[in-house]
Structure formats: C-alpha cells, structure tokens
Curated annotation (Swiss-Prot):
Protein family (similarity comment): Belongs to the glutamine synthetase family.
Record-linked PROSITE patterns: GS_BETA_GRASP, GS_CATALYTIC
Domain GS beta-grasp: 442-533
Residues of the GS catalytic domain: 540-865
MF terms (GO), sorted A to Z: hydrolase activity
Listed name of the protein: Protein fluG
One Gene Ontology term, aspect cellular component: cytoplasm
InterPro entries: Amidohydro-rel, Gln_synt_N, Gln_synth/guanido_kin_cat_dom, Gln_synth_cat_dom, Metal_Hydrolase
Compartment list: Cytoplasm
UniProt keyword annotations, A-Z: Conidiation, Cytoplasm, Sporulation
C-alpha cells in the first residue's frame, strides 16, 4: 500500500530526464571565475548587477547547500568557492558524477558557446543513457552567415535589395538544409529558439507580401556580420527562422520522429524585453502549427500562468519547469509549481535544470526541484486534491515519462527506481523488471530471497525463477513463521509463539546476480509484511526506512550512510594431536596499509574481490591492509541508509564467496587476536543540511548507551571497548578527527561511528543511531559535551568533567541491553515489540555463548560471522 513516505521517496529518487541543459566547462576552465562568474549559478544578472546576487535568498540557500556538497566547514562564499576549487582539482569528474546522480538522459543545447566546454557526447560517461542534442536555430543561422561572409564580398549598400537576392537565396537554402539534416540526425531530439532574447516572442505570421521586408532584414544582418561576429537580431529575419523551422518540422513529421521546438520564455538577463518575453505572444503561432509540439522553457517566469493557459488549451504545448531552480527563492519555487498545476495537466509538464558550465547548477536545480515537488505534492495529498497514487504518477510523469514520450527517447527507468521499499510509479511493472533482469542475466535460474533476523543471520529461501516470478506477480506468497522473531543462530526459539506467520515481499531494487560463487542464482532483499499486506515495524529494513523518513518528513534532513568492511582472512588448520579443526591467520607478516611479501600474495584475491563487486555495480572507494594479521578493509560507496546496508550485506557475501574459493574463511569476529586490533564495521553517517548537526549529535550522545545494544550486539563486541586501540575508547563523547572517541566528527554533519562491528544487524544499528539523532533534533537538545581532542580515558576526571564527559560506555552486552530497556524514548521510536523481542533474543544468545569455553565460543562465532 502506497504511503506518504512512498511518495516522498519516489520524488527524491526517481530517475529523471533533463530536457534542457548545456555543456559543462572543461576542467581547465572550471575555475576561471573572471570569465565565468560562479555567482551566475543562481542569478541571470550580468556585470555590475551580479555583484548584488550575494544578498538574495537564493544565494544564501545555495551557499549553504554547496557547503554540504563540498563538505566545507563554512557556508561563507569564499570558503565555499575555495572548497570547490579543491574539489575540481582533486576529482572534477567525480564532482560531476555526484552532481548528475539520478539523471538518466541529458538533452543538451550544445550551441550556447564553443569555447571552454566539453563536447556533448563527453557527458555520456555521467548518465545512464547517451546524451541527446537540442539544436539552437539562431546558432545555425549565424554559422550560415559566417560561411557567406567568408565566401565572398558582401554588398556595401544594404538598401540595394537586388544585390542581396542571391545571398538571401543561398542563406535560406543552406539554413533549411542544416535544419533538415538535424531533423534526420538520431542524436538530435529537438530544436530551440532564443528569439525571446533577440526580438521578442511576438512572432509575426507568414505574409508573402513581406518578402521585401524580409530581404531588407537579411541585408542589414549580413552587412553587420561582415564587420562583427555574426548574430541574427533583426525581427523579420528572426521571425522567419522560427517559421521556417516550424515548416520543416511539420513537413518531416510524416516520416521522421517527433522533434519539438523549445522556446526560451520569461526569465533572462537584461538582454530581453520583459514584456515581449510573455509566452502569450506565441498564441497565434501555436495555433498556426498544431502539428508541431512547443516547449515553453524556464517556467516562463514571471509569466507562469500565461504559459499554463497555453499548455492547458493547446494539445501541442508543454510547460518546462526549469531554470527557476535555483534562481528564485524557496517560496517562489513552490508558488511556481502550484501555478503550473492550477490548470495544466500533469502530463504536459516537463523537468529541466538549464544546467550550464558548472556541474553544481545541475545538482542545485535537481535537489531544490525534488524538495519543492515533494512539499507541494504532499500538501495536495493531505488536502485531498491528489490520492497518493495520483501524486506518485504525476511526479513520475514530470520527472521522467513526459519527456520520454515527447522526445521519443524510448528510455526505461532502471530498477533502482523501485528502491528502498517504496512502491513507485514506473511504467515498468515488477514483472517487467524481473523479465528484464532475466534477459540481461540469462544464466540465472534461481533466486535467493533473503532477510536478516535479530541475530544478524542472513536467512535464505531459494526459488526457481518461475516460482519466484509467481511471488512477484502476487500469484503466491512466501510465509515465514513468527517464531523467527525469537530464533537464535542454531534455530533454537527462545520466546514468543510458533503460531502465525508474516510474509516476505521482494524488493526488486536489490535483485542482483550471485557472483563469486558457482551458482546460477541471484539474491534479493525483502520486506516483512502482515497477513493484510501491511508493513511490520519488527522488520529491520522497514524500521530503518521509517526512521529515515521521519527525519526527512519532519525536518527536511536527508541521511546518507557508507560502510567500511573490516574482515580477517583465516586459513583452516588441524591440531595433529586431536584432529580438531581450527583457524589461523592467512598472513602474519602484515600491518596497516603496508604491502609486505605475504600481503602481495593476497593481491589476486583482493583484486578479484574489487572487480567482482564492480561487475554488479558496487564500486569500492578503496581497499587496503588493516592492522591485525590477515585483516583487510574495503570501503563501500555511500547511499541512502537502507540501500547502503543492502550494499553492505551483498558485499560481505561476495567477499565470503571469493575468499572461500581460495580455501580461506572471511570472518567479522570482533577481536580474533587479543594482542592485535579488533575488527569493526565502522559507518559514516551524514545529514544534509547540516544546520541541525549539534542537536542531532546531542540526541545520539544522550541515547548512546542504549544504541550500543544494537551496534555492539554481542558479548564479544565489548572486547573492543578499550582505550588505545582506535576503537572508540571507553566514554560517551565525540571529537573532531579523534579516533579514540566513539563518534569521530569528520566535517559538518558527517560522523564516523566507531562502536560498531559485524555482529550487528546493521539495519537496526543504523535505525537506532538515526532515531537517537532524531530525538535530539525534535527536542532541540543543546550539545553539552564539548569537542574532545584526546582519548577521554587518559584524562583525569576533572578534565573530562570540563568537557562534559560524564558517562562511560557500557562494557558488556548486559549493560547496554539494560540501557535500552530503560530508554523509553528510543524504545517508542523503534517500536516496543521490536525492542522487546530483540532483548529476549540477545539475552538468550548471550546465555548460550557464556556456557561455552572461550575457544569453543570463538570458533562458534567465526563459523557464523
């Protein structure tokens, strides 16, 4: 059943088609601010007027958001620009890739300038599909003028029309040929006119008696081109360019794909005549060419309602919602969206960034548009104007389907559109997604449906593809006993009832080939649903999703997570006296970030892991030797919290598969060697915007003892709660770049959680951490614990007190479970039933393990984690 969270998630994550943008600057020109002022990302002003841009709401908002993009400690413009310079020099393509994340296709008007920019097809590397072209007709005309001027002398007397007749015929013939060639070019999907800038939108209808007037206009234009840069800015000629393009598009539509004409309307610099930028002037032209589709660009601001009227009453008119994001304030953006929807069908609205020169123009526009769309659509649903399903359909149409249909792109949104547990309105059904996956992976014969229980055990049900398809089509259901809530790793049920069941619903966004193992299978994560199909709060993935959505819905905070996998590779050994099998380090001449002789022997395995993960779209950020014997670290890319944990689980499985092929065992056991560093699973968590970082952190610290029940979820985990081993030490505190604090601050709104290891159910661990932060923001808690630059355990009590450090970390699972049991706020947020069941399971697990001797307990855990 779709919920408001489903709608919000769709708006924030659905792939988009950017139907109007421009080329990016090359890296060598990306910081030439004297030539390309960076302030123009939020203003159309030029010259002296641009100096006033820093006083606008849009500027302040953009500066704050860009600070989070660059992880700048300050939103001061000079600091932001300095951070940008570093980002451009360090990894320009990485910055672009981040800014274009979520973009399926770019439609580029690549004739804005020929200088300092990358070619249109260079942009393909950053999007899911190939870039397409929008051809600017005034640029074509200027190129023809240039050819004529350089091909021979231009008559001096512009009043002698007979002298220009031949040149006019050549111009009109060559211009028409260029337009016709572009119509036939499959890389071109549309045309654009900037007549709004040149002579205004009041394009005059065709009148054969005006031939003399047209040639006079041409004569003036080419005479000017002979002495300066060719530019068409004479009304009769500009009007003719538009009409001739429309005539050619009309004639070609019988045999060629549909190629609309985009027109700049409204918002622009002081080159435009504001009155003549009103799209109402186009009404007679639109009526004259019903066979050609018109796209009114840039929300026609400030004439959005006039454009909306045209898009409502003429079936060949579409309203583009671009450029005002991020050029105008938040309130104005929401108002423009509301005006656009007053009478315009949602199927006639298109999205574009008008991104140009700077990749950040794309990032800001997409981010602000998604936020405004979410705010407006949620309001409409809450007021009863839309159902949730209608709003989801409209959002998907605006972001993707309308442009896909209008420009005949034949794009399919990737399965990532069905992400993180939200039903989305894609034109592709779940069945189609499965069929597409099978076509792309014909060797897959089985699907492993997976879920993670409270012991962090991955439970698996395997289905032949045809049977799995029945689940996807809802022709059958996959029921699981409720006893799973209270089940230990060895299937002992320690509480609750064996009566009743819940159902696993596949999340097809996680469907992925099972790689690194000799198996014709794929894996998919699942959601837990009730008999009635409702989400269960006991489901760890749902719980994390709900907490993340509360942050977003109530405070506009977007959380992002990324994980470091620390893992020890062990080799099997046999005690010759007893025949008992055990494990020993795979390498011993080994230390942090070194490449020893033994480490080099591991390179084929390490590189196989990296390449195998990349083959399924998981691209490691780095990997290296860690401190303990046989210990390595693999750093995963960041994502939304649920997707990040999904990636973590999948990556661990791939690593285990490959290591087993090499005759080794990969273990997440927290402290395999008492004399060496332990094994963690540190998480990076960031919130955006970072303006609430202090209250968020205050909430985390206030509830941290209870959070540890989820992040350090086994007795063995507390062998790492010690000072001096870079594991977070022993006190509830935080510190900037302090690896002896349980929470290391890295940049504004970005922390590393040190008190976390591979025994944790990571969905629950992240849910608990975010829930604690949520309480701080909701209660506006002050941050009373100061930034600690030391190992708090090494400080005398008076110095700890001066820093506000008063609470020790629980040093046993029993203590952290007791803290959770007494934390009513956290229990309520995570769900009383979930917390109660979790505590039952963890106490029973602790009792079972404590009955074993140390060697047996270690072996038992290494075999399972």
């Amino acid at each position: 059943m779709a919920t408001l969270s489903s709608l919000r998630h769709l708006i924030q994550t659905h792939p988009l088609i950017d139907n109007h943008a421009h080329n990016l600057l090359s890296q060598s020109a990306a910081c030439k601010y004297a030539k390309y002022p960076f302030e123009q990302i939020i203003s159309e002003a030029q010259g002296v007027a641009l100096a006033n841009a820093p006083s606008t709401l849009s500027f302040h908002r953009a500066a704050s958001q860009l600070a989070t993009l660059y992880q700048s400690s300050s939103s001061d413009w000079d600091s932001v620009r300095a951070a940008r310079d570093q980002s451009v020099q360090r990894d320009y393509e990485g910055l672009i890739r981040k800014c274009l994340e979520g973009t399926q296709v770019l439609l580029l008007d690549d004739l804005l300038t020929e200088n300092d920019v990358e070619l249109f097809d260079w942009h393909d590397r950053f999007t899911a599909s190939a870039t397409k072209r929008i051809v600017r007709i005034e640029a074509l005309a200027a190129s023809v003028l240039s050819q004529i001027v350089h091909g021979g002398p231009v008559p001096q007397d512009s009043s002698d029309l007979s002298a220009f007749q031949t040149l006019w015929e050549s111009f009109s013939r060559n211009f028409s040929a260029l337009v016709s060639d572009a119509i036939a070019d499959p890389a071109v999907v549309g045309f654009k006119s900037v007549i709004c800038y040149r002579t205004g939108l009041d394009v005059q209808p065709t009148d054969d008696r005006d031939t003399e007037r047209l040639i006079r206009s041409f004569a003036r234009t080419i005479s000017q081109a002979a002495v300066s840069t060719p530019r068409v800015e004479d009304k009769p000629l500009n009007d003719w360019l538009v009409r001739q393009t429309l005539n050619l598009l009309k004639a070609a539509k019988v045999t060629q794909p549909n190629k609309p004409l985009q027109l700049h309307t409204g918002l622009g610099d002081n080159d435009i005549n504001l009155l003549k930028s009103n799209p109402a002037h186009l009404q007679s032209l639109i009526a004259q060419y019903p066979e050609v589709d018109f796209v009114l660009l840039h929300s026609s601001y400030p004439y959005t309602r006039e454009a909306g009227y045209l898009a409502c009453v003429y079936p060949n008119v579409y309203l583009d919602l671009g450029e005002v994001f991020p050029m105008v304030s938040r309130d104005a953006q929401e108002s423009i969206l509301r005006e656009s929807l007053e009478i315009v069908p949602s199927t006639r609205l298109l999205w574009s960034t008008d991104g140009h020169f700077f990749p950040e123009t794309f990032w800001l526009a997409n981010r602000q548009f998604r936020d405004a769309l979410e705010k407006v659509f949620v309001d409409y649903v809450q007021n009863g104007d839309y159902t949730i399903e209608q709003a989801m359909q409209a959002a998907a149409d605006i972001l993707f389907h309308n442009s896909n249909r209008l420009y005949e792109l034949n794009e399919q949104p990737p399965s990532a559109a069905l992400s993180s547990g939200h039903q989305t309105v894609s034109r592709i059904s779940s069945t189609d997604l499965l069929e597409k996956f099978i076509r792309s992976n014909p060797g897959v014969k089985y699907v492993w449906t997976q879920f993670i229980d409270y012991t962090a055990t991955v439970r698996v049900r395997m289905f032949p593809v045809m049977e799995f398809a029945k689940i996807v089509r809802k022709q059958r259901r996959l029921g699981i006993s409720m006893a799973t809530f209270w089940m230990l790793q060895d299937d002992e049920v320690v509480g609750g009832s064996t009566t009743g069941q819940f159902y696993l619903i596949p999340d097809l966004s996680t469907l992925s080939p099972n790689v690194g193992i000799d198996s014709k299978s794929a894996t998919v994560m699942t959601w837990w649903k009730s008999e009635q199909g409702e989400s269960l709060e006991e489901c760890p993935r749902t719980n994390l999703l709900n907490i993340n959505n509360k942050l977003k819905d109530e405070f506009g905070i977007q959380a992002t997570c990324g994980f470091e996998i620390e893992v020890v590779f062990l080799k099997p050994t046999t005690d010759p006296s007893t025949g008992e099998e055990d494990w020993a380090p795979s390498v011993t001449n080994h230390s942090w970030s070194q490449m020893t002789r033994e480490t080099r022997r591991m390179l084929p395995l390490l590189e196989e892991i990296a390449e195998t993960l990349a083959s399924i779209g998981i691209h490691l950020q780095q990997f290296h030797a860690e401190s303990a014997p046989g210990q390595f670290e693999f750093i995963l890319p960041p994502d939304n919290p649920v997707a990040a944990v999904d990636t973590l689980i999948k990556s661990r499985q791939v690593i285990a598969n490959i290591v087993e092929k090499h005759g080794l065992r990969a273990t997440l056991y927290p402290r395999p060697y008492p004399s060496a560093a332990g094994t963690a699973s540190h998480a990076h968590v960031s919130i955006s915007p970072s303006t609430k970082e202090e209250s968020f952190l205050a909430g985390v610290l206030q509830h941290y003892p209870a959070v540890l029940a989820f992040t350090l979820s086994g007795d063995a985990s507390y062998d790492r709660v010690k000072s001096g081993i870079w594991a977070g030490s022993e006190w509830v505190t935080w510190g900037t770049q302090n690896r002896e604090a349980p929470i290391r601050k890295i940049s504004p709104g970005h922390w590393e959680i040190k008190s976390l290891d591979g025994l944790a159910n990571m969905y629950l661990a992240m849910a608990a951490f975010l829930a604690a932060g949520y309480t701080g923001v909701k209660e506006n808690l002050p941050l009373t614990i100061k930034d600690c630059p030391y190992d708090a355990a090494s400080l005398p009590e008076s110095e700890r007190a001066a820093l506000g450090i008063t609470t020790k970390l629980p040093n046993t699972l029993a203590k952290s479970l007791a803290a959770l049991e007494s934390d009513e706020i956290l229990r309520s947020l995570l769900g009383e039933n979930l917390v109660e069941d979790y505590i039952i399971v963890k106490r029973a697990e602790s009792k079972k393990l404590s009955a074993m001797d140390e060697k047996a307990r270690r072996k038992w855990l290494v075999e399972r984690y």
